[in-house]
Amino acid sequence: MDVSTQRRIAAAVLDCGIDRVWVDPENLEKVKMAITKDDIRLLINDGIIVKKQEKGISSARKKEVQEQKRKGKRKGPGSRRGAKGARTPKKEKWMNTIRPLRTLLKELRENEKIERSSYRKLYRMAKGGAFRSRNHMKLYMKEHGILAE
C-alpha cells in the first residue's frame, strides 16, 4: 500500500528526512486515511508513525588508533609526513641536547669536580656542538683527565 504522501507530510511534521519516517505496517489502513497534518500528528502521538533514530558514525576505529598512538605505535617511516625538521624543529632538538649538558656542567662546577677554566672551555665546546649527549661529554672529560673523581 502506498503511503508516500503521508510519509512526506510526517517528515515535514517530524522535521526529518522521508527515510527516517517509520510507519507501522499493521496500521497501514489508518495511515492511508490520514490526509492532513493534524491527522498525521494524531498518528505520531499514537505511535503508529515514528521518527527513526539518526544513524551516527562509529568512533570505535578512531579510539583504537588513539590507543595505539598513546602506546607509541604508528610512528614508523611509512606514517611520517613532512621533513625531519618539521616533526621536531632544529631549535627544539638543539635545546633538548644543550640543556642537559649545561645542567651537568653547572652541577660539576658547583660540586667542584671541575675547575672554572675547564668549565668555561667545556661550555664553549658544548655551544659549538662538540658533544652529542651527557655521556659523550663525560667520556671526553675522562679521556682528557678533566673530571676529578
From Swiss-Prot:
Residues 55-69 have a biased composition (Basic and acidic residues). One of its GO terms (molecular function) is structural constituent of ribosome. CDD domains: Ribosomal_L19e_A. InterPro entries: 60S_ribosomal_eL19_sf (IPR035970), Ribosomal_eL19 (IPR039547), Ribosomal_eL19_arc (IPR033936), Ribosomal_eL19_CS (IPR023638), Ribosomal_eL19_dom (IPR000196), Ribosomal_eL19_dom1 (IPR015972), Ribosomal_eL19_dom2 (IPR015973), Ribosomal_eL19_dom3 (IPR015974). Residues 70-88 have a biased composition (Basic residues). Transmembrane segments: none annotated. Keywords: Ribonucleoprotein, Ribosomal protein, RNA-binding, rRNA-binding. It holds the Pfam family Ribosomal_L19e. GO terms for cellular component: cytosolic large ribosomal subunit. SUPFAM superfamilies: Ribosomal protein L19 (L19e) (SSF48140). Residues 55-93 are annotated as: Disordered. GO terms for biological process: translation. The keyword RNA-binding applies. Binds to the 23S rRNA. Belongs to the eukaryotic ribosomal protein eL19 family. Part of the 50S ribosomal subunit. This is Large ribosomal subunit protein eL19.
